[in-house]
Amino acid sequence: MGAMFFGLMLFTLGWTLIDGSESEQDFMWHVRKIPRLVSERTFHLTSPAFEADAKMVLNRVCGIECQKDLPAPSLSDLEDSLSYETVFENGSRTLTRVKVQGWVPEPTQNLTSQGAPVRRKRQVYGTDSRFSILDKKFLTNFPFNTAVKLSTGCSGILISPNHVLTAAHCVHDGNGYIKGSKKLRVGLLKMRNKGGGKRRRGSRRNRREVSGAGREGSQDSLKETAKAGRRRKGSARRQRAADGRPSFQWTRVKNTHIPKGWARGESRDPALDYDYALLELKRPHKKKYMELGVSPTIKKLPGGMIHFSGFDQDRADQLVYRFCSVSDESNDLLYQYCDAESGSTGSGVYLRLKEPDKKRWKRKIIAIYSGHQWVDVHGVQKDYNVAVRITPLKYAQICLWMHGDDANCTQG
């Protein structure tokens, strides 16, 4: 299975690079100047209730045609949407207002496909082309090791030793923070030790209890009980490994950042363009992570293909990888027919391109998978699995969240 999957990966990469209409320049990361986001003022807000229900599907999302008819957002509108809420581990919450400097408006992207009849709601299109990553050689190595699972049921991706990028709706429904996000945890993939791992040393209290029990009962009965317990635990671990289900190391989230473009409250519906959030981990990890990149246009995608991995709920905690071509785009969204189920939302969408002036290739995150949505295209409803593009402004915002200033956010 592992060899076949590796061969398929090589074939896919080669297939995306053989189109004679594409030049070598099209397969490079183009360094772009990033506008500055400056924190202007921070306000303390009331602590959230964490009572909202998770909302995975938004009805009648403003699609490409709809966005094309809207006036271009003003600088004030952008600054309002890019201002952000931060929720801390102790339940406190703040709102930070930002100023944008050096922003150059981008031209509106053209529609890349023609109108189509209304489609039946679905998240897997035709033959299911997803691949479960079962081989440990792939599962715990880059790029698959960058995928993480959220305790709220979504996926995410490691973008630094301390940060995870995910979809905003995984923690906030646009009006309030969802149930389960108060004590949010992130599960990182880890290797299973042979034989189920090392046995932890018991606490001093547990050792005292065992000592007391030993005085009341025979040492032989205690040994038999301990052996039986270890056999049961070892059997459960081996069964999970045989099923291809990964093991997780769970880490608490220290704070969460969400743009105001999503967390609009009761006054307006959340904007799908801002369905992304950054989670700061309480403890850093030592795994290889994936860097951010600015999303290129469809014409600059090798073969028009994107890739992402997540924990689809219909595959029992297996890590699922998929790749597909992008159908349409707007300035902020990518519309595609990648096969995916709930649980994979929040996954990092990435590309593998060549670095400028270097011979090596590098993967970078260019979008966040938002899930299955209905969008208005040419006056009809079309269903797409949608990803939120990382634009220069969003790159600057996420970088500001990570570093606290714009010192490392000038180019992307």
Swiss-Prot record:
An annotated GO cellular component: extracellular region
Glycosylation sites: N110
Cystine pairings recorded for this chain: C154-C170
PROSITE patterns: TRYPSIN_HIS (PS00134)
Main location: secreted
Compositionally biased residues, Basic residues: 192-207, 228-239
Compartment(s) of residence: Secreted
Signal peptide, first to last residue: 1-23
Positions of the Peptidase S1 domain: 124-407
Protein family: Belongs to the peptidase S1 family.
Protein name as annotated: Inactive serine protease 35
Organism this protein belongs to: Bos taurus (Bovine)
Lineage: Eukaryota, Metazoa, Chordata, Craniata, Vertebrata
